Amino acid sequence: MNEFLAPTAILLITTTTAFAGSFTFPADEPAATVEIPDDWQPTETDYGIEGNSPDAGTYISFDIACAEDMDQVMTDVFAFLEENGVTADPASQKESTDQLNGMSFQTIDWKGTDKDGPVSIGVGIIGLSDEKIAIVTYWASTETEAENLPEVGKILATLQPAE
């Protein structure tokens, strides 16, 4: 789903919106910062931060893991999606590699379904450092995805390693 990477390009031609401020996460061992608008109701999680678009059609989360924990992280991501009724169509899987703010950004995308109907699903793996990665989990209703993509791009563009 190149639509997951497209927000980064869209960001370059869009204006800035009001952000809630910068979230540094995880709280106990900061590894990254990201800005999420207030109306996305950002909340901290055990390993990061998450938010939902105002129309509840798009979910995005950022979690931190050690590079050697990648297999467990991916298992946890799929367990989370399953717990939330999100099912990916394996035949629709697409992978891509790009750069985001100078960091390697690998995405795996699928089409799928949730309790409300068709969705787009994305998992992004961003290399913050040799030891730490950020995992971006994304799912969006196909009905509202295009409307929320510009904001997703702006959120992604704020992701940086913590100083």
Identify the function of each model-found stretch.
Residues E29-F78:
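Secretory pathway targeting signatures of secreted, lumenal, and periplasmic proteins
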Residues T16-A20:
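Sec/Tat signal peptide C-region and signal peptidase I cleavage site
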Residues M1-T8:
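Bacterial N-terminal signal peptides that target proteins for export
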Residues E82-S129:
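Signature of long, low-cysteine stretches enriched in small and polar/charged residues
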Residues D38-W40, A134-E163:
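Surface-exposed amphipathic alpha-helical segments
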Residues S61, T107, I135-T137:
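Structural recognition of the beta-strand scaffold that forms the well-ordered cores
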